[in-house]
């Protein structure tokens, strides 16, 4: 997320790296927005995988967060919130509402899974 680096001077990867070194968790659950070039995916699905994620890959940040990098399982959850067409990126006017709704769905699912 470019805002993380912009506001803190630290990339998402660096923040996660510091937390993992300090707290030594048994798993990373990474949630991030995704860019898509298919309009039918925009605000319309949730991607879940165990192969990791590259936060900021749409803006050419390419440090992968995965089991090989950190030595612990990584569950990556991505939501396509940005439509990428050529070099331009677009969001819908109601992206804030979509984030609120989607974050509720994801957090409820994680709470049901772990608690």
Residue spans of the language-model regions?
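Active-site histidine-anchored catalytic micro-motif
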Residues: 6
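Short glycine-rich substrate-engagement loop in P-loop NTPases that contacts/grips substrate
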Residues: 9-13
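Glycine-rich phosphate-binding loop
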Residues: 14-63
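Short, flexible loop segments at boundaries between secondary-structure elements
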Residues: 58-81
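C-terminal functional extensions of proteins
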Residues: 77-115
